[in-house]
């Protein structure tokens, strides 16, 4: 008990001077794309509730989406750490889609062989936004329903991209 109290007090002292912001965002779209794949068509409502702290270096959030037919539902938790142009994001993604070939009935199941979720890690570098607004990103599914056909091994599917705005 005493150690827990000391840890909580130290964390409070470290974060006591840090600025924090609460963000709530909602989008209505005509479909939902993820890494170039259509996840849902039709009218889609996407929401994001996040809390940013430590002078914009740490963000934790909840992200959700659903479509107008109710055939697509998604709920994610995420953590994003930023420092010196670098960012590391960890996303815990869970879809509640009917007809899925994965377990979408046990939300808290984190068993590697039977979970319906996946954990995604993204490492990105953001160059100077005013001089050279390029972002390079590497994302890998590190756990969950990205398994080999015999369900024995994680496949570690990876998505790499470069992003450069041509019009602002």
Explain the meaning of each model-derived region.
Residues 1-23:
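Cleavable N-terminal export/targeting peptides
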Residues 36-41, 72-76, 99-108, 146-153:
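Outer-membrane beta-barrel translocator domains and adjoining extracellular loop/strand segments
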């Amino acid at each position: 008990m005493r150690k827990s109290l000391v840890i909580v007090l130290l964390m409070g002292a470290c974060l006591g001077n840090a600025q924090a912001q609460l963000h709530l965002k909602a989008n209505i779209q005509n479909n939902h794309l993820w890494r170039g794949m259509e996840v849902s068509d039709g009218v889609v409502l996407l929401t994001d509730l996040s809390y940013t702290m430590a002078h914009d270096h740490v963000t934790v959030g909840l992200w959700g989406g659903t479509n107008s037919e109710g055939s697509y539902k998604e709920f994610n938790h995420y953590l994003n750490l930023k420092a010196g142009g670098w960012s590391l994001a960890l996303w815990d993604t869970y879809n509640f889609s009917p007809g899925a070939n994965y377990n979408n009935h046990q939300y808290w199941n984190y068993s590697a062989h039977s979970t319906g979720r996946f954990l995604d890690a993204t490492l990105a570098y953001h160059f100077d936004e005013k001089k050279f607004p390029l972002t390079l990103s590497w994302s890998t599914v590190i756990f969950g329903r990205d398994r080999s056909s015999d369900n024995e091994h994680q496949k570690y599917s990876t998505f790499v991209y470069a992003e450069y705005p041509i019009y602002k």
